[in-house]
């Protein structure tokens, strides 16, 4: 699956056509009020491009939350999004109370030129994800012929298809892979994601550094192994570092995270790194806490001293930060996935913050810096660095699966150039 050879919106002829666009409007809500409109704002360039280039209509579809195939308009309706979209676009948005069926097909068949239409939550139908639950909460699977009918109805709502929902690209859901139209392009958000991951995974500049944090080795095995085939350097930090250090250095790790499953493959990982000539940097000192709590008593430890019984490593220390700074300064391409400590708590955020500062500095000197989604993207938001790195991915799960070397169904379904 080549990321850089997929059809993109700027190469798609939209004039006079109805564009059906899969977007990610899965925004946080409180009492039916949107608390963060970032994802809606992010879709505006693709929508405006279609309107500015003479599209007859833009029909938008998205999921919101996890209604599991049960219509829950009181809790998971996209109606508030239509209101927000209207104010961001400065034009009317027609909101439909369903996403498939005769009435929806009729409304989208011959809309007034320049119309913007938002469909109701795709996940009110079990056929979107292929599984869900019935109103009583019992798990159910969608019937194949009903999935086919659902996809056929969606396919009638547009003449060309655009996918701008990278965050769901790792899911083979109906709206991602089942719209049957001859031209299927990535929107601008999706294109930016694919461009940056292509830079990292298909033709990287070197030295290439991967920084991998997070809690469990077992969760990151596939990621570590795939990246070891691509990078020159790797920093391993976060909770999973303690498993490596215990196995490799026989370090006393106190009550720190230890991953029994992951421990079994630490030596395999190190052998692969050695074979590929990849240098792995681990933390050498730690900020510790006497409990897993924001107000824990704070201590310090080194690999040599070990961590006292009952205490746990919750961040890396100042010597580790110096080592990280040296490794980052040499790189020309950096992919970072996973924080180095419990960054949500100030006492244990310094390691991740120091690394973020170095990444920002490297970016300003021309290094390409790609931040995987999830917690690392949250760090960028917390320290206001989203515009100071090359790219912050909008898809936690999707970016992780790409870095693991997996094929994303939502990307594979797009037309090739």
UniProtKB/Swiss-Prot annotation:
Positions contributing to AMP binding: 215-216, 220, 239, 313, 344
Residue(s) carrying Phosphoserine: 2, 4
Reactions mediated catalytically: (2R)-3-phosphoglycerate + ATP = (2R)-3-phospho-glyceroyl phosphate + ADP
Enzyme class label: transferase
Function text: Essential for sperm motility and male fertility. Not required for the completion of spermatogenesis.
Residues the entry annotates as binding (2R)-3-phosphoglycerate: 23-26, 38-39, 62-63, 65-66, 122-123, 170-171
Provenance organism: Homo sapiens
Protein's recorded name: Phosphoglycerate kinase 2
Keywords, comma-separated and alphabetical: Acetylation, ATP-binding, Cytoplasm, Glycolysis, Kinase, Magnesium, Metal-binding, Nucleotide-binding, Phosphoprotein, Transferase
Gene Ontology CC: one annotated term: nucleus
HAMAP family: Phosphoglyc_kinase
EC number: 2.7.2.3
Post-translational modification Phosphotyrosine, affected residues: 196
Pfam families in UniProt: PGK (PF00162)
Recorded metabolic or biological pathway in which this protein acts: Carbohydrate degradation; glycolysis; pyruvate from D-glyceraldehyde 3-phosphate: step 2/5
N-acetylserine PTM positions: 2
Position of the signal peptide: none
Binding site for ATP: 215, 220, 239, 313, 344, 375-376
Cofactor entry: Mg(2+)
Cellular localization per UniProt: Cytoplasm
Residues binding ADP: 214, 238, 343
GO molecular function annotation: ADP binding; ATP binding; metal ion binding; phosphoglycerate kinase activity
N6-acetyllysine PTM sites in chain numbering: 11, 48, 75, 86, 97, 131, 146, 199, 267, 291
